[in-house]
Amino acid sequence: MKKFYLALVLLALLAQSIDAQNKKRLLKFSTNSGNSRIFEYDKDGKLSKMQTIIQDVMDKENHVSTFTYTADKIVQSFYEGNPANTDTRIAILENGIVKSEALTCSYAKGGLPPYTYQYTYTYNNHKQLTEILEVPSIFYTTIYKLTWANSDLTLITCYRENEPMGEIHLDYDKTIDNPYLALVFNPLTMILSKGSVEPMGQLFGGYFGTVFKHPVKSIHYKVLKKDEFLWSAEDDIEFTYTKNADGDITEVTATEQETDKITLEWSKVTNGIATTRQATNAANACYTISGMRQKAPVKGLNIIKEPDGTVKKVIIR
């Protein structure tokens, strides 16, 4: 089950893959074991609904997340089967970046109040996420420190009580370097997802700052304190990507102790680049490489779409 959720994490982020020329968006992916995930988007190109269907041995599970957006927050509602039992995740935005989140889980045991998770995020001057503070109402406080190299997140170190518990080492497929392929896999989902509550709307929209330049090729786990780290070397995993003649990724192979293949279904979009923000300039639409629409070009690589449909890259130094 852990492996399946890791595969879900991988493929869910493919929905943010932007191809400004083909104008395609991921609508669905399915695994060879019969599991699937379906994506729906609002008129602005933001992820509005995500449905995950898990074909378990005994029963079929149906997980649903919905996302609503305002200028200062994102509200995610999640339920499994019964909408009466809904978990709520609220992201607080500052200048278009998530600064904190509060997750309230509906499940309560033994008459106790529903448990919660509080997240606080720290970024560097390049808008790269460098630290995550996770404070649950039960269990231990955890700090994740993130190390970047050449525009990619390469190391995540997990700390409890100032002692390192383990490391997540990330290697990337640098043969895939397409500015429109904004975010194929986001390792943040491994540490930000609690249960089945995955902050995909926040991630799809680039609300966690800088996105990654390349898709992940492999993940390796190093245990520093036994029985205190969620993963081990047995969870190491490698990914390979298959493209069609148009350059779209149509299949992903995830190899752990077993091999799982995931098929992707894409569809044309009618409103140009999938956007996550409204722009005030109707003449020229400006986007970051993550597909985030903005008022004006910013430092770094920008994607400019002109009224005639022409798309060009502009670098601001």
Spans of features found by a protein language model:
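Positively charged n-region of N-terminal signal peptides that target proteins for export
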Residues: 1-4, 317
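Sec-dependent N-terminal signal peptides
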Residues: 4-13
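Sec/Tat signal peptide C-region and signal peptidase I cleavage site
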Residues: 14-20
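Buried hydrophobic residues that stabilize the cores of well-folded domains
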Residues: 21-271
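Residue-level detector of functionally pivotal "anchor" positions at catalytic/ligand-binding pockets or at interdomain
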Residues: 22, 266-292
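A short beta-strand micro-motif
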Residues: 27-31, 286, 304
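A short, hydrophobic C-terminal helix/tail in secreted or cell-surface proteins
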Residues: 289-290, 295-301
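C-terminal tail/sorting-segment detector
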Residues: 301-317
